[in-house]
Amino acid sequence: MVTLMPYNYAAPRCGLIDKMIEPKVKRPKTDHTDTHERNRLCNLSQQQQQQQPQQQQTHQQQQQQQQQSHQQSHSSTVLASNGPSSAGAGMGVGVGGGGGSGGGVGGGVGQCSPLGLPPQSQPLQPTIGSLASLSGHYSNGNANPNVNSSSCSLATASSFAQSAGSSFSTYQQAGGTSGGVSGEDGVVGGATVMSHWTHDGTGSSAAVKSESRSPGQVHASLDNGSVAGSNLYGCSSASNPLDGGAVAVNSSAVAAAAAAVYDGKHDYYYYNSMQQYTPPPFYSGYGTPYAAATAARQAKMEPGAAAAAAAYLTPSYAASGNNNSQLYSSPYAGYNNFGQQDYGGYYNEQYGNYYSPANYSPYAVSSPSSSASHGHGFHVAASSNLSESPTDTHSTTPVHQTTHSPHSPLPISPSTGSGIGPLGNVSAAAAAAALNSSGGSSVGTAGSGGVATSKTTPTGKTGRARGRRHQQPSPTRSTASDTGNSEAVKPPERVFVWDLDETLIIFHTLLSGSYANRYTKDHSSLMTIAFRMEEMVFNMADTHFFFNEIEECDQVHIDDVSSDDNGQDLSAYNFATDGFHTNTPPGAPPNLCLPTGVRGGVDWMRKLAFRYRKIKDIYNSYRGNVGTLLGPGKREAWLQIRSEIEVATDNWATLALKCLSMISQRENCVNVLVTSTQLAPALAKVLLFGLGGIFNIENIYSAHKIGHETCYERIVTRFGRKSTYVVIGDGNEEETAAKAMNFPFWRISAHSDIRALYTALDMGFL
């Protein structure tokens, strides 16, 4: 039974509402930054508290009004929880709906609270009453005049939103447009979801002005006059601010579920507000720091404002223990981590950097489809790109928008029409297209007509991640082409590191006779073929690659001495008369090369660099036309030797070449050769065995001096740790080095191993 008492509707009810839901505990002492502003705004509320002693009756009257307003405005059920401050929490319900065929009525129950948030919670947050009123007032296409259902004036509500001591409240703006009519099952124009889901302003012509811009109202002018949704709580409403035709709404099932979440415990939350508005321990505010990055990407925030938003959200909202940002976030809110409510400050302060480094190993291929498991980073920082992994653009790796890792702080949206994370205010199709086209780093902005534009860097990073140092060692970074990960070139997804002898080609076992013994071949004939090929290899190395001059000063990579090259034109340079091999220190052996590589000073090193540059030019010029380099006479002999080797080895090189060709045809994979042979004869082998078209000379390394493991470290330094490395070889040395680097190893010991590798590549397992 409800007793209706006479009440003066001209007087504001701010004081009653505040006193009605006031916690019955000892209030902590809070220091406000501006006491005059608080006293000025809540002066009426203090007078009303002294004049109205009937608290319980007005309490029941207010509850009945809220229930009636909730039932009548079933088309736009927006029931918001109050601010997280346990010091002085007020209850406000903002109801804004596009009623009728063209009009939008913005109503709200204003609130005033003499108690505000603690000092660290002072940045502006809009209240329910003020923003519900302003949303109806500034709604585009509003056919009816603004109706303020609260007895507080619009000026009072709007000025209260500016106060430093205002309670934190979420809100819902439902801008009724000419196309938004009353739908079925409680769905009308405007996003009808829980207010915690949609922190989005739909007014496109004017925004709520404030002196200190909150993350929800950052730079409305940057989006052509539209207020881009900031998605402070990780979810978006998929509404389109500039779409003049219709307003995108979520499904009625989501709205019904959202209403049921609150309605089922309406009385419980209402009467026990002082316990419930300090969130229960099974809700987690774990993802609140990540909302700053989401807001920055959505509203195109500059780094200064982004840092302010991150600093605002993390200490004042998450670290203070007020982690009810996900109280009504989604039906899946119960699946969040447990027990972090009482230790919110401990988690955010002590373990704030736990997710900062990318401390997972991208090298271990645990399954054939392991590339998909690295599609989303498991441990990422708040300002880093969530989708920075190179597998996002692979054609065979699908990108699922709603798929997150088990430890991902981003909630899973229950509706396919709602955006994920930074891709708010964009339709699902446009979000997927932007994600796939820009490598997962697109920033969805609300353009005219809802067209999503992407903002990305060539490496797939966001603008704020530009220029950061890579968290990787650089053991032997030496030259221009063998440098770290360049910002202008996206690193490959997979790097296949091949061994040369007995993996890609059969050569040493032919010379030793072990291949003939294993496969019961003619020992003498195979050795004869092998010796002929060996002679051709060393002739090419001596004639064209200066092997007789640089044998004792062999390098690991073709560009290791390029820093000593002054770029002199070598077209008319005479290498035979430059005195390179005669400038030897007194008393030194004839072909001594010191460990540092310095033999005859700067001039000698420059001449050595000239030779390696000439080797590089010859390789690049004749890699696809070796017969021209050999000459007509040697060309026929070379083709004959290759044909005989193919017959003797049962087309071993042909099978390996198929695997190499399949990898080289992929846009995001690269073949790298690491051989124990010296660099000059290794280049001759590559050309003579027909592999020059596959391997660029920059992708060939010699492990003759430094070993395979050091070569692998240099390769990782060059391509970066985000790539996946697969080592393919036949010996124990390659396998040991691969295990030391945590690289998967594919052993090649027979023809069946090459066929299995080809099948794995063809099926997309590698």
From Swiss-Prot:
UniProt effect for mutating K705Q: Highly reduced ectopic eye induction and diminishes degree of ommatidial restoration in eyeless phenotype rescue assay
A GO biological process held by the record: ventral cord development
InterPro entries: EYA, EYA_dom, EYA_dom_metazoan, EYA_dom_sf
Enzyme class: hydrolase
Annotated Basic and acidic residues bias: 22-40
Keyword Acetylation: no
Described purpose of this protein according to its UniProt entry: Tyrosine phosphatase thought to play a role in transcription regulation during organogenesis through its intrinsic protein phosphatase activity. The phosphatase activity was shown in vitro. Appears to function together with So and Dac in eye development. Required for the survival of eye progenitor cells at a critical stage in morphogenesis.
Residue numbers annotated as active site: D499, D501
The EC number(s) this enzyme carries: 3.1.3.48
Annotated spans, Disordered: 22-131, 200-223, 365-419, 437-489
CDD domains according to UniProt: HAD_Eya (cd02601)
Name of the molecule in the record: Protein phosphatase eya
Binding site for Mg(2+): D499, D501, D730
GO molecular function: DNA-binding transcription factor binding; metal ion binding; non-membrane spanning protein tyrosine phosphatase activity; phosphoprotein phosphatase activity; protein tyrosine phosphatase activity; protein tyrosine phosphatase activity, metal-dependent; transcription coactivator activity
One Pfam family linked to the record: Hydrolase
UniProt feature, compositional bias: Low complexity: 45-76, 365-384
Compositionally biased region (Gly residues): 89-110
Subcellular location: Nucleus
Cofactor(s) needed: Mg(2+)
Mutagenesis / variant outcome for changing E734Q: Highly reduced ectopic eye induction
Disulfide topology: none
